[in-house]
Regions:
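ASCE P-loop NTPase helicase motor core
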Residues: 106-182
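Walker B catalytic acidic pair
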Residues: 102-104
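Conserved P-loop
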Residues: 1-66
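ATPase catalytic-site recognition across NTP-hydrolyzing enzymes
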Residues: 166-215
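Short, conserved catalytic or adaptor-binding loops enriched in Gly and charged residues
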Residues: 59, 68-75, 146-155, 213-214
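Loop/turn-to-beta-strand initiation segments
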Residues: 76-77, 96-98, 123-130
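Inter-Walker segment of RecA-like/P-loop motor cores
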Residues: 39-97, 197
């Protein structure tokens, strides 16, 4: 899934390089990768370093998780930032050409409320990819967004895949996945490996019914 999302980022970057931008737009190309917390950015950063062609990179700052990108005559440079969603108040005041949200199921509604306006800035391309396993609750933003895209919202697309759709898995890998049914509650296994939505897929199930008084 990360490679697919990276492909969308790369396409947005390449498309932007031929679209003139007003000189007041700083940075000329701006992209974020949003993760639930900063420690979870390590894998994303390592993948970026392996996937972005070196010719595209001007310089990097690993501590801040920022990559300055080489540009073109119409967009002199670009900025790619890995952003943590643990502090929603830090996720504002930017307009984005591309937003990639990873592990969407673990990002709070409050953080999404700050992320969404970054895609409503005039002059920006405002493309986005949201990926993850199903959220636990029907009122979570990722669940609502998937439902809207699945129902045909304009300019949105919904894709669903299971672990069995991964062509790189060996028969041994598949056997291990099947064996995890012995270790996990089936509702959790189906959420993790089949991407099935189930409000009882958490380790504390029936919570909603208990809250409603139906014990």
């Amino acid at each position: 899934k990360s490679r697919s999302a990276f492909g969308e980022f790369l396409k947005a970057y390449q498309d932007a390089m031929v679209i003139p931008v007003d000189n007041s737009m700083v940075p000329p190309f701006h992209a974020w990768i949003a993760v639930p917390s900063f420690p979870q950015s390590n894998q994303v950063w390592n993948e970026l370093m392996s996937l972005i062609p070196p010719a595209f990179i001007y310089r990097t700052n690993q501590d801040d998780r920022t990559i300055y990108l080489r540009g073109s005559q119409v967009r002199p440079w670009g900025l790619l930032e890995v952003k943590s969603c643990h502090n929603p108040e830090a996720l504002q005041t930017a307009g984005l050409d591309f937003l990639w949200v990873t592990e969407s199921q673990d990002i709070a509604n409050k953080a999404f409320e700050k992320l969404l306006p970054t895609l409503r800035s005039p002059g920006r391309m405002s493309r986005a990819v949201f990926e993850g396993i199903p959220s636990l609750y029907s009122d979570h933003w990722f669940r609502r967004g998937c439902a809207a895209a699945s129902d045909g919202r304009e300019n949105h697309a919904y894709f669903h895949a299971t672990v069995y759709d991964n062509p790189t898995l060996s028969p041994e890998d598949v056997a291990e996945v099947e064996g995890d049914k012995d270790l996990l509650p089936i509702r959790v296994w189906e959420r993790m490996y089949l991407a099935n939505f189930n409000e009882d897929a958490g380790y504390f199930n029936n919570v909603s019914r208990c809250i409603a008084g139906d014990l």
